[in-house]
Amino acid sequence: MIEVIITIDYEIYGDGTGSLKKLVLEPAALLLKTCSKWRTPLVLFVEAVEFERIMRQRADPAIELVINQLKMAYQNGHEIGLHIHPQWHKGTYQKGKWHLNNIEYNLCQLPEERIKDVVFQAVEFMKNALEDSKFSPLTFRAGNWLFQPTQPAARILYDYGIRIDSSVFKGGRFKEYGVDYRKAINNGYYWKFWEDVATSLDNGRIIEIPIYTKMVPFWSMITSKRLQIEKSTQHISKDKKSELAMWLSKFRNYLSLKYPQKLDFCRMTIRELEQAMEEIIKEDNKTPEQLKPIVAIGHTKDLKTFDSVDYLLKFLAYNEIKVTTFKNLYPALL
């Protein structure tokens, strides 16, 4: 039994460049409209620390419109998850430019008290933004998917109500940050964890529902659509040699010729999405009684066209595959 969760990381670029209007507000509005068309719920992973700093520093007048959009999405039944890039926590905005602390790029590598401060700030911002003093996020996604070393961050997040994480993508690795999700490949469609997010633990307190991935030849990832998205960032050069160097740097994290391809409706072509879903359905036919949560991912900053996500939702509707949220799925996982 397949249940698909459509998630979007709701944020601007990680170095602070780009406008809220172009990278968050407008793409999210069109995505919400597309979800409404197909009557599907959405999970928005809101980069709360980023927005808190933008509001505090008065860096972008569109922040009020973003907050209004979040409130409307929340009131309309979409799920709001917590997403944190800690380099924003004490960021400053001077002369039209953000100065972020990239030494604090991985939340999990910060001192315990620092993690507490960052998470507290993020949750308080969300309560105020949603005008709901009782708001408690059920679901978390780590910035840049960095959720190792898992403790003490997991315990702190648990204390704030987090019961589901969706940071892992099977086969993923970030050598620079000491993150390795390759051992999660055989963990199943979801699992409980505590000490290490990639290690299944029967009595774990948090459930991991990973971003769906499949291992593919690295060369198959170099498509015109992905390259166009990379070009759109202000910190990627447009010359061909630089593009190739950028991709090679990504693949240095892997010792084989296989690369984990996320189910990413911003970066995948219609054909890639179709093939991925056909494989998932084929696998489900072997054990239709088994619950198989499938997490698709996108980023507002990457949402340049809507043909792929519209096709994905159409495909799911045609094949009568349920689209849900983490919150709605949670009772079935206990």
Name every feature range the model reports, one short phrase each.
Residues G14-E26, A48-L65, W88-T92, R141-T150, ...:
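Acidic-and-aromatic substrate-binding clefts and catalytic sites of carbohydrate-active enzymes
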Residues P41, A48-L146, G204, E208, ...:
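Metal-dependent polysaccharide deacetylase catalytic core of the NodB/CE4 family, i.e.
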Residues A142-T287:
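Active-site-adjacent pocket scaffolds in enzyme catalytic domains
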